[in-house]
Amino acid sequence: MSRACELTGKAVMSGNNVSHANNKTRRRFLPNLCDVTLMSEALGQSYRLRVSANALRSVEHRGGLDAFLLKAKSNELSQRARLLKKQVAKKLTEQTEA
């Protein structure tokens, strides 16, 4: 399981701890990842995703998983999220046509 957000692509970064004496030691900055279950209204199913706390706030701000996925850039999404985005878009176009 990678340490990257499935919705925003946030991943591990590296940098330095810098002491008061300006000594630098390498460190890793880990994203704040949460295992959450999000509901898709269009598909009527819940999905388990590993997302950052920031992405979780963005999902709620945009009005749910479906709205977030439709507005998100595909290159930031994980493979699973891209597939989910495609399914949601297909389902919504079917509903608007009917």
UniProtKB/Swiss-Prot annotation:
Tell me which positions the record assigns to the signal sequence: none
Which GO molecular function terms does the record list? structural constituent of ribosome
The alphabetical list of record keywords is: Ribonucleoprotein, Ribosomal protein
Q: Name one GO biological process term.
A: translation
An example GO CC term for this entry is:
cytosolic large ribosomal subunit
Any one Pfam family match given in the protein's UniProt record, by short name: Ribosomal_L28
State the InterPro entries in the record: Ribosomal_bL28 (IPR026569), Ribosomal_bL28/bL31-like_sf (IPR034704), Ribosomal_bL28_bact-type (IPR001383), Ribosomal_bL28_sf (IPR037147)
Q: Does the keyword Protein biosynthesis apply?
A: no
Q: Does the keyword Ribonucleoprotein apply?
A: yes
Family, per the entry? Belongs to the bacterial ribosomal protein bL28 family.
Q: Which PANTHER family match?
A: 39S RIBOSOMAL PROTEIN L28, MITOCHONDRIAL, LARGE RIBOSOMAL SUBUNIT PROTEIN BL28M
Q: Which NCBIfam families match?
A: L28
Name the chain's protein. Answer: Large ribosomal subunit protein bL28
Source organism (scientific name): Chelativorans sp. (strain BNC1)
Organismal lineage:
Bacteria, Pseudomonadati, Pseudomonadota, Alphaproteobacteria, Hyphomicrobiales
